[in-house]
Amino acid sequence: MDKKIEKLCEKIGLGIAISIIIIIILFFNINEVAFGEIILYDTLPNYRINEEVKDIFNKDETIIVSNIDNSEEIGDIELIGIDDISYEHEKTDEEVKKSNEVSNSNIDIKKLENLDYLRQEFYIIDASTGMSKDYFDINKFLSADLKIEKSEDEPKVLIFHTHPHEMFKDSNTNDINEGIVGVGTKLANILEQEYGIKTLHITDSSFDMVNGSLQRNGAYERMEPTIRKVLEENPSIEMVIDLHRDGVNENTHLVETINGKPTAKLMFFNGISRIMENGKLNNISNLPNPYVETNLALSFNMQKRATEKYPGLTRKIYIKPYRYSLHLKPKTMLIEAGAQTNTKQEMYNAMEILAELINDVVFS
């Protein structure tokens, strides 16, 4: 009898042990998925976190999931904290499709108070950053003082190009004025001649060159001393525009017909000096930008005006970490007009509309 009881106990003990092992295996498998995703999300700037995992770690009013799944290099991980992360990677078709989704021209302000709805309608959020209510407050955006008095005597607007060698489909690559610099000249001329807004245009072509070779890395650092000096010498300047063109797949054409003309699409770009770490948005302490809120208010109001007036002209606002050139003045904009697959004329047509929007939002 004792032997039977002993054997029974051994079986029960073995069963309990097996059950415990199974529970442990299941526990670690589940957590490996969840925490593995968080690790990938925090480590790889473009890893899209699973929605269920997001819900575990997202308990406040912060959206930490990207609404794109792009293909930027993992090498950017090593550059976190450097103010020159390239955002001009060749975008995937899916990313371009997302950014080209047209916002509803009948804007419902009340709905935009919901952070998730605001994101869906207006923004593309890079996976290495996120949105929080303190920065993305629709009521603050709408009440922001963005107005500037016009002047034909003193410059009010500064236009420059951190990447001046960006070219277009039909550009003569040997002539700097055939690329984005020439587009900046067009914008400056329209602002002055049609709207009476004195504008200074910097055509320095050295920012993205090192020893005679094209070098985008470090362009923002090389740009800043020159532009800082210009701003010090021209204290009347209140609005700064860093004008770029995007980089997309060669089969992508960012164009919309506006006023009967083929017009390159515009995309407003914001770096918010915040990065996602361990499921939380943290300030990037060595890249301070005291003007983030005004930057965001300006791009939002430009996007809103464009959506109301010219549906389809603008892509969604692109949000990334870091600060780029956006810390130079409160009313600073980084704008990507068209891409390398657009023609010069499509770009010039876009400048007519961009100048109109600037006048509407800032100078009227």
Regions found by a protein language model. Name each.
Residues 13-29:
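Hydrophobic membrane-insertion alpha-helices, especially the h-region
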Residues 312-364:
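Active-site-adjacent mobile loop/cap segments within catalytic or ligand-binding domains
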Residues 290-318:
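Active-site-adjacent substrate-binding region
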Residues 155-175:
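Short glycine-rich His-centered loop
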Residues 164-167, 205-209, 245-250, 272-276, ...:
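Solvent-exposed loop/turn segments at secondary-structure junctions
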Residues 172-187, 191-256:
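Catalytic-core regions of hydrolytic enzymes
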Residues 30-150:
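N-terminal, intrinsically disordered, polar/charged segments of Gram-positive cell-envelope systems
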Residues 249-287:
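A short, glycine/acidic-enriched catalytic loop
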